[in-house]
Amino acid sequence: MNRAETGHRGEAAAARWYQKQGCRLLAHNFHTRMGELDVVVQEPDGTIVICEVKTRSSDAVSRPAAAVNAAKQKRLILAAQHYLQCTGQSDAPVRFDVAEVFPDRKSVV
């Protein structure tokens, strides 16, 4: 399995996890000039969750979330602002998550 396939499977696993928690999937791989939003869901209380998904093997040297540095966070914020404006949800409460997916452990953290 190549990196793109691994990433897509991780994103699908994260989306399924959120849906099992009662969230509604709003977008998957939403592309903007500023970057891509991996998974966007809405919690039952209306909160929009922007989720950056990082998929790694369990023998990775560092935690997957460590890859979401300040520059990546800035791009995510800009992409999220664009998404919220495009969908008319600029006033909704928003939360940013990082999902760590470990396919060989079959887990989402």
Language model: regions and residue ranges:
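Short, solvent-exposed loop/turn elements at beta->coil junctions and helix N-caps
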Residues: 27-31, 99-102
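Acidic-basic catalytic patches of nuclease active cores, encompassing PD-(D/E)XK
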Residues: 1-28
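Conserved catalytic cores of phosphodiester-cleaving nucleases, focusing on short active-site segments
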Residues: 18, 37-60, 68, 76
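Hydrophobic "anchor" residues on beta-strands that sit immediately upstream
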Residues: 24, 48-50, 93
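Acidic surface patches and DE-rich sequence motifs
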Residues: 32, 43, 104
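Catalytic cores of nucleic-acid endonucleases
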Residues: 55-104
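Conserved small/polar residues in nucleotide/adenosyl-binding loops
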Residues: 108-109
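Short beta-strand or tight-loop elements
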Residues: 22, 33-37, 94
